[in-house]
A protein has these predicted regions:
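Phosphate-binding site recognition
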Residues: 1-173
Length: 173
């Protein structure tokens, strides 16, 4: 099959459904998995499109990719908090989508998860009651091991795995 490439989007509906099922549950949805397994695509494409199709206005979706130089300023948790709060201008529900949150955590903070300022910022945003927060990250030290402990019962993990053979085979027909 020389030169055979899969030039289509593989709908990972079971992961999308997990996010939909957790929508507005009052918890930070933490999407974890190894690098390049589709976390960002799930959040910024599939879930974003779902929100728009279900009637959410674009202004109510705050998307931030912390690995993008455009958002480098928001790697500081206080700046991130100010930015997000400045976008929340009504009582409607706002969907906060943050990609690669490990960029907002200092390496020395990883030694003591209770001192991580980002978690305090996200927990503070949850108190607004009209926000629904989704984050992704690849750092296993930061996300997978202690996610529920660090969020003090306010975290809900969605683990994403690389595409399976079953998904691939279904996509190629």
């Amino acid at each position: 099959m020389e030169g055979c490439y899969l030039n289509q989007i593989i709908q990972r509906n079971h992961y999308l459904q997990k996010l939909i099922d957790r929508r507005e549950n009052g918890l930070v949805k933490v999407i974890t998995g190894i690098r390049r397994c589709g976390k960002s695509f799930l959040l910024f494409n599939l879930f974003y499109d779902y929100l728009i199709e279900s009637g959410v206005k674009e202004e109510q979706i705050i998307s931030i990719a912390l690995d993008d130089d455009t958002f480098i300023k928001y790697r500081d948790p206080e700046e991130l908090s100010k930015f997000i709060r400045s976008k929340i201008t009504s009582k409607e529900t706002y969907y906060i989508l943050i990609d690669e949150v490990q960029y907002a955590i200092a390496k020395d903070e990883l030694k003591n998860p209770d001192s991580i300022r980002l978690y305090n910022v996200l927990n503070g945003l949850l108190r607004l009651r009209n926000v629904d927060i989704y984050v992704t990250g690849s750092s296993s030290k930061m996300l997978t091991k202690d996610v529920l402990t660090v969020f003090r019962g306010r975290g809900d993990e969605v683990r994403v795995y690389p595409i399976s053979f079953k998904e691939y085979y279904a996509a190629i027909g």
